[in-house]
């Protein structure tokens, strides 16, 4: 197996619990939505978020809010929704109401890979790049802000859907100094891991508390780790 030069990380269920997104971030966004729409509806800074929504849902605060609630109830990963969620979370992160609860092994292992192995660490999540940066800039660890440790960020807008091989090829093509076989993608999602492997990356399934149960087939087909510590040095 080729040495790993780039570690590409999923977020939800990989570096932090799925429950943080489902039980903390999503409810926070829904609670903040009406007041934000009322305060920012006509402000220039909000215009791009509003304009990204389909016209039939962007005509009034009520129709936009109803559409957001509908999309979130179905957990649909649509880019304009993800962008708005990041906007809503920004206040919570900045005022200290929101802090990302990274699993205890994450920050020490990222530091180890960077400092001892010389690897680059990058992020690929269905959450928007601005939302990713908010999360890693406001963690429960010490230091709280680990953005300086991360070299690049990818989402469904700048890379594509996470279950498609072409998305991983596109990500690797942006950093051609690292052959695709020297990338390691870590995710809790079996289909994402399969897509990354099809593209030529190394990839492991991360099995964290609260994640979906893995099938026996998935466990036989892929390497499964419960902690980044199990990966050790690259």
From Swiss-Prot:
Gene Ontology MF terms: acireductone synthase activity; magnesium ion binding
Localization of this protein: Cytoplasm; Nucleus
This protein's GO CC annotations: cytoplasm; nucleus
Pfam family, one: Hydrolase
Binding site for substrate: 125-126, 162
Catalytic activity, EC: 3.1.3.77
Binding-site list for Mg(2+): 10, 12, 188
Domain of life: Eukaryota
Enzyme class: hydrolase
Keywords from the UniProt entry: Amino-acid biosynthesis, Cytoplasm, Hydrolase, Magnesium, Metal-binding, Methionine biosynthesis, Nucleus
Cofactor requirements of the protein: Mg(2+)
SUPFAM superfamilies: HAD-like
Similarity comment: Belongs to the HAD-like hydrolase superfamily. MasA/MtnC family.
Matches recorded under PANTHER family: ENOLASE-PHOSPHATASE E1 (PTHR20371:SF1)
Function: Bifunctional enzyme that catalyzes the enolization of 2,3-diketo-5-methylthiopentyl-1-phosphate (DK-MTP-1-P) into the intermediate 2-hydroxy-3-keto-5-methylthiopentenyl-1-phosphate (HK-MTPenyl-1-P), which is then dephosphorylated to form the acireductone 1,2-dihydroxy-3-keto-5-methylthiopentene (DHK-MTPene).
This protein's name: Enolase-phosphatase E1
